[in-house]
Amino acid sequence: MRHLLSAADLTRDEATAILDDADRFLQALAGREVKKLPTLRGRTIITMFYENSTRTRVSFEVAGKWMSADVINVSASGSSVAKGESLRDTALTLRAIGADALIVRHPASGVAAQLAQWTAEGEGGPAVVNAGDGTHEHPTQALLDALTIRQRLGSLEGRRVVIVGDILHSRVARSNALLLNTFGAEVVLVAPPTLLPVGVGTWPVTVTHDLDAELPGADAVLMLRVQAERMTGGFFPSAREYSVLYGMSEARQRLLPEHAVVLHPGPMLRGMEIASAVADSSQSGVLQQVSNGVHIRMAVLFHLLVGSSDSPEAVPA
């Protein structure tokens, strides 16, 4: 695996190996007073975040540091981009400095793939990880969601996963639809017609607008935030009406099977797409997702920079 740009880049075997190694990292670090492994000692990881982020940015930094890598953060405001330098020149500069991996988040779709192309000119070049590109994809989020479902339910094959909310602006929805399909899960999208993207009919999903009808048969429900910062018009009449039709209330939670897990990629708008009582309930996997984010990103960096778990620097058993 050279880069991770899309959930579609992963075969089922590759994705399973990443989930398995994430679990192994979790076990290797459990109970350690000092969370440190030598796996990536001497490697340099540079994070390039051109959009605000808490969970993804911090978990990538923690993942690298827990594996003894040198992790450097480059932001738009603190780099020469603020002086007018192009993203291409920034990327080539970081390659010349000796970066082993570039973790990029950017408001424009396709930037991660472009970065991989620019830095691959000639021989070598850093591994590139897409940490979210516009409304396109967020593959490591899909991996950690899949890991959380697998930990809760034991398997992904044949599971019914319902993704609810602002599908139109969600890179998480697209990556989850692709990855869960790879794992053999059934994916159902629930959203108002105004929040569904053009071309959603080509995705490996079922689309509906009736949330209540889908909950009794759901094994997992992924609630999405309404991304008001990406909206230029009125996509629904009001926040209250949206919450009534598409929010995960306590009443809706009671429609779920007892084994079902409720997920949210964050940040959550409590009281809009999810009630606080649901987010904090025993069926919620929200904090488990956050924890899994570190271990998944450790596993991704391991596979990109070291190789398979059969290599000499394998994940600790």
Swiss-Prot record:
Cited Pfam families: OTCace, OTCace_N
Keywords: Pyrimidine biosynthesis, Transferase
Reactions performed catalytically: carbamoyl phosphate + L-aspartate = N-carbamoyl-L-aspartate + phosphate + H(+)
Record: residues binding carbamoyl phosphate: R55, T56, R105, H138, Q141, G266, P267
Pathway where this protein functions: Pyrimidine metabolism; UMP biosynthesis via de novo pathway; (S)-dihydroorotate from bicarbonate: step 2/3
Classification via SUPFAM superfamilies: Aspartate/ornithine carbamoyltransferase
Amino acids binding L-aspartate: K83, R171, R225
Entry GO CC: cytosol
Keyword Transferase: yes
HAMAP family: Asp_carb_tr (MF_00001)
Function description: Catalyzes the condensation of carbamoyl phosphate and aspartate to form carbamoyl aspartate and inorganic phosphate, the committed step in the de novo pyrimidine nucleotide biosynthesis pathway.
UniProt similarity note: Belongs to the aspartate/ornithine carbamoyltransferase superfamily. ATCase family.
Name of this chain's protein: Aspartate carbamoyltransferase catalytic subunit
